[in-house]
Amino acid sequence: MSGRARVRARGITTGHSAREVGRSSRDLMVTSASPGDSEAGGGTSVISQPYELGVSSGDGGRTFMERRGKGRQDFEELGVCTREKLTHVKDCKTGSSGIPVRLVTNLFNLDLPQDWQLYQYHVTYSPDLASRRLRIALLYNHSILSDKAKAFDGASLFLSEKLDQKVTELTSETQRGETIKITLTLTSKLFPNSPVCIQFFNVIFRKILKNLSMYQIGRNFYKPSEPVEIPQYKLSLWPGFAISVSHFESKLLFNADVNYKVLRNETVLDFMTDLCLRTGMSCFTEMCHKQLVGLVVLTRYNNKTYRIDDIDWSVKPTQAFQKRDGSEVTYVDYYKQQYDITLSDLNQPVLVSLLKRKRNDNSEPQMVHLMPELCFLTGLSSQATSDFRLMKAVAEETRLSPVGRQQQLARLVDDIQRNPVARFELETWGLHFGSQLSLTGRVVPSEKILLQDHTCQPAFAADWSKDMRSCKVLSSQPLNRWLIVCCNRAEHLIEAFLSCLRRVGGSMGFNVGYPKIIKVDETPAAFLRAIQVHGDPDVQLVMCILPSNQKNYYDSIKKYLSSDCPVPSQCVLTRTLNKQGTMLSVATKIAMQMTCKLGGELWSVEIPLKSLMVVGIDICRDALNKNVVVVGFVASINSRITRWFSRCVLQRTAADIADCLKVCMTGALNRWYRHNHDLPARIVVYRDGVGNGQLKAVLEYEVPQLLKSVTECGSDARSCRLSVVVVRKRCLLRLFASTDHTVQNPPLGTVVDSEATRPEWYDFYLISQTANRGTVSPTHYNVIYDDNALKPDHMQRLTFKLCHLYYNWQGLISVPAPCQYAHKLTFLVAQSVHKEPSLELANNLFYL
């Protein structure tokens, strides 16, 4: 057994029916780790005890195509052309205002012959062959294809040269003597900018990176041979690259960026053993399911990742399964024979991963059994991400400066061009690497911050915290009736904190009265009980001084005060108040958050467009129920864009999301009308949280629902014009300012709307944040609908202005404020509340 067949030995566990193990009608896949990843021995872990438990159903995994082709982008978006319907930018979508700046990108030209074409053939076999490998072997045996550049995925054949006939018939014979008729039918002549060609180019480059000894994990490629170890936290970082080939404004370009994969030097068996010691046996299996199902593990022998969908406690390593050839072998013997690995725990359960078929294949998913001691956990746990020192250690290794990033990119291109196999692959298809793309961007002017008593031009455009000292906010509500709930050992901190809070509040124009202080035991139940007893309807705000950052404290308080008893709440850690040296800045931050939660306004910027409503939409999955989608909708309700209407809805399908947006928009328009006695003249919606391949759904389902909500608000709504902008923070493009033979981060306010953008979209990139360390990331904006017909300069400038209006930070952020508000709202609901917040809080930024 060799190659992929050796990697994937399939069979059925003896003594288990298909119903019992939850397998599909197809064979079982078995995988393992490589030799040396596990210590040989006959010891037994503390979890090695028999459990008479059934197999849970799991919640499904990623599709089989995603498993095999995770690096591919979702090429459905290549067919979504929105610019042609936007008449005001059909001929030109670039702006002109701002100071020109010379930029270097992480894009590289790919040169093709002028008359280059790709020929696509549909291949059929009679009789049909189930084995993809056999289909490829029989086809490639024919001399008609021997001297041609070719690629075959089992159904479609791609050639760089056209065959003589439109339909070509070939005959092959298998080793068993069976005659197979192969028919090749020309289906398409493809040009370089066609979606199929773009997908094809990406396949070629994935193959090239594999030739450079990189391994594909998820969407990206990594070098396990060059790990960066962080031993104090038992972590390994694999350096690698995210890549993509696409057709930009007028060129085919190769896009690459440096990426790191975080791996834990801890197996699932190690994790289970530690969990058992911490929780005890009574709830061990339940906790295993809760903490492991949904995680992604790596089997290091083939550097492939799998999602844990279930844990089967009834299957042990000593049990046998049936291989393809019909023989039976135990898991123990299989790993020993194939990889010289001795399993150390013979009573460990097996992890179950479900691999679904292709998108249009309705068959049941294929089931994979994995050995816990051979599976390494990937990524960082929530506990790890809250560890400041750990995250700092990771950041020190992964945050590359612009110069360091450029050096890594240059090395990648050099490796491709120097590698004979990679170079031959490119030349075979007529591809040649060109120069790195340089272009001219523009830097838009910085903004003035408008306060109650004066206007300030920040000394440092990205942060105006120092400029706001002793300045009054635009408006605030006095806080007279409020509670502080704390444990006994935090009592001595309260007076000093209150004194500081009232002092900074007064200087801001936020009057803070003396609260009612309630002391409780150090348990989540005690805090919640005190709030339930003392939280009468007249209470304006509840502050809880929490003894620790245990999630159950925060979750129980936020859930009760966001939904069951709607009152704005503020949670503060005791250790935060213990830092006397930072008390002033802590009190200022808290005073600003409390002002917003009571309906106050902190600052604004000049908005030339009158009667403008801006909307931010974001979605995420609920942390407890992954089938539930949390939709956050935040809309401005006044002309200076300082007051907000916030709504959060829980849904299950894309159609439900579109329907709920109509309800949310109607509520926002009604709230605007109540506040302004008229409907807005313009609405600009910023839609965040759009994954790859979802752009078409947003355009076809969500935009019509938003339009319908506007038109159904009455005759006045006919003059209300709508724009919808899709926002993406995680884009592959990087920009570097080129100065004096070196590179650095571009200036704040840099806009790119040519050469690195897409010809079929009205899109642009904007840098609205700074990076003190590392390389700054631009945010991508794609205007998919625009009744407002705003000029590119105006749309770009408005977007930049909105990045100044996030009240949880006295500075610029990477996305427009309504998007960040929607993100904060969905995160709170998805992680802590798990149900829709009360509409009584909709007029306040209660989630800051």
Swiss-Prot record:
Residues 1-52 are annotated as: Disordered. Its main location: nucleus. Gene3D superfamilies: 3.40.50.2300, paz domain (2.170.260.10), Ribonuclease H-like superfamily/Ribonuclease H (3.30.420.10). GO terms for molecular function: molecular adaptor activity; piRNA binding. Changing D688A: In DAH mutant; does not lead to arrest in meiotic prophase and failure of transposon piRNA amplification. Interacts with PRMT5 and WDR77. Interacts (when methylated on arginine residues) with TDRD1, TDRKH/TDRD2 and TDRD9. Interacts with MOV10L1. Interacts with TEX15. Interacts with SPOCD1. This is Piwi-like protein 4. It comes from Mus musculus (Mouse).
